[in-house]
Amino acid sequence: MNYCYDSPLIWPQIDIPKEEIFVSESKSSVKPEEIGSLTPANTGSYHLYRFVHAFEGAECSSVVFLHTIPGYQSPIKERMLYSSCKGNLIDSLTRHYGIEIQRKLEIEDFKELTSVFLIDTLHPKEVETPLSFSRPKGPAGRGPRRLIR
């Protein structure tokens, strides 16, 4: 079963006493700006979000893994569990469920999570690097450099 394509937002959580990951909620139609209002501000969490958007005239669907870090508002054990389980969760989502995750983001404040932010993150603008100064060649006929001791 592929959860991510049935609903755009999946909310896996860790049961701290049992140290197990389970899917606590899923939502059907959620905009990126609304995810913060669904999440408690004082606990860490994971979100698997399918972001459907238009880019350069084409319809795109990208899966984004969000790891919420509430700062120092949550207990240390909870922060450590969420940080240490992230890699295994992503690996199992990829291997067992076949979910291809385009971006993995760590977010401390949901105010920065907007559609524009996700589009810029998923489709970064290519920056042209200016040509750097190329050093001119030395005079011809001087021979190879010698090491003087």
Give the location of each predicted region.
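Long, low-complexity regulatory segments enriched in Ser/Thr/Pro/Gly and acidic residues
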Residues: 1-63, 67-149
